[in-house]
Amino acid sequence: MTRLLLLARACLQGLMCAPAALTAAPPTGLMTDLIEHTDRVWINGYPTQMTLEEAARSIEPVQMALIYNRRPMFSWVLNDVRPDVKQTFAQIQVGTSREQLSRYRSDMWNARFENNDNSTTVIYDGEPLKPNTVYYWKVRTDNNNAQQDWSEIRAFRTADTLYDYKTAYYPQVKSDERPVSVGRLPGGDLAVDFGRASFGQLVLTLDAQQADTIIVRIGEALRDGRLDRKPDGTIRYREHKLALLPGRHTYRIKIMPDTRNTRNTPPLAVPMPEYVGEVLPFRYLEIEGYKHDIAPADIERQTVHYPFNDFAVHFTSSDTVLNRVWELCRYSVKATSFAGIYVDGDRERIPYEADALLNQLCHYSVDREFTLARRSHEYLLNHATWPTEWILQSVLIAWYDYLYTGDIRSAEANYSLLKHKTLSALEEEDGLIVVLNNPKVDSALRDSIRLPQNQKLDDIVDWPRGEFTFMPKNISPNVFHYASLELMGKLAGAMGKKADSAAYASQAARTAASINKYFFDKKSGLYRDGIGTDHVSVYSNMFPIVFSLVPPQYQPRIADYLVSRGMDCSVYAAQFLLD
């Protein structure tokens, strides 16, 4: 799915989409700890006009993105679209007064960076920041040694407690939406369509001559032109009786919690914040017993999501189907961000590492802000799920986080935990890991990888599980074990941990050699599912080729095999198949 979005990345990162006049401009898109709108204040999920200073005097509960780090990181968009231009100098000023900073007076930090092209990971190194304090900063650059104007001033507020490292994040917010169509069904019921589904709440403005009762039905799916009242699986449907008051009134349809996705026992469901309230995914609405006319303006869906820039990227092609697929991918990232952490949808509202990996890669392609991916990753580091491969994928997520942000701080802060996530404790002499009936899968191991004691560690391969023959030692977890070792070596190198980097590289090489020795069948030219079976599958062959484990002379045979099988896997595994 994410590969459909690759064409948008260049525009997203400011590398293409230049205006007609190739000119320089002051830096824009200023971020503090990867948050752009640090100066924005919300009330109950809606943006306000308040400044950070005014928010401290508000009688209503307010929400904002706080900065938790003693030494936050600054970044900006160079905003110079002329060819062959690079930043050659930067100056940052940080102060406690907007007025003073506008006069180029900075009482916290005034840093000059000569011969420097870093515009993404500049770490604060001024006077100690205080908790619960508003600060201001701005930046200017020289591009090809030509001085540019100062940026606008950006404000941020520190949290009540400051840390050596803690990820900043936005509150969940609301967007009000109106239906795309309103009509009557045979029999007179109102039928409303919002055009696409979202996680939200419903507000209706209705008229009544006298006290009356109507039935409001909301859901995700239609059957024979009507709302499906008994949908399959975890497709949602709700029915509410609403007592009307005489006159014209606005009613909020209260969404009640579902015990299937609001449990507070491990594995924990991610709760909705009190200022937002409970939500339900729905697209369609039916109202029974309401005889008055109703305008689209009287029907409001309050969609809940993580802050998202709908105009950060643009994609179009001559293929209308491809355009629709791209828009589906883009919108899905926004729509499924309702919990403030990547979750599995409304089924359990639980994060899973594999889901987070796919969400992460897709999200990177459709917006400029990456804190939702990082926050989800760090949550999962401490709330692991049961599949062997998905625990190993924590290291992949950490690597992509560093690759796309250039910010190594999250990996540094979680380095010890990431080391455990490689599952090196389960390695045998050949460098391969095995989970089934392994006495090393004990309470100490579960604690080390943050897996609940009541959870069984088990190989998954795919979900739903496809055509794969499970053995005690399977290729799928071992390929991801190799990938985690290789990427831990790269992360260690980025941190300057040379000895660790070399050790992980050596460990990865041993595992790679064993994968090719024990799983590859020279007779068929394909990789087996596990040691002890001759069965081969899409999974056992696509995972090795994705992570460059296949020697060049065997790649054509495996490629032909994968093409012959088509999309013989789930949406999750399709990510790797497309890779």
What are the residue ranges of the model-derived segments?
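Bacterial Sec-dependent N-terminal signal peptides
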Residues: 1-26
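Extracellular/oxidizing-compartment recognition motifs
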Residues: 25-134, 138-339, 355, 371-372, ...
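Glycine/proline-enriched, intrinsically flexible loops and inter-domain linkers
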Residues: 99-100, 345-351
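N-terminal short leaders/motifs
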Residues: 223-244, 341-346, 491-496, 519-530
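Flexible glycine/proline-enriched surface loops and loop-helix/loop-strand junctions
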Residues: 268-269, 340-345, 464-469
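Second-shell loop/turn segments in exported
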Residues: 311-318, 346, 362, 471
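Active-site core of glycosidic bond-cleaving carbohydrate-active enzymes
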Residues: 351-358, 362-579
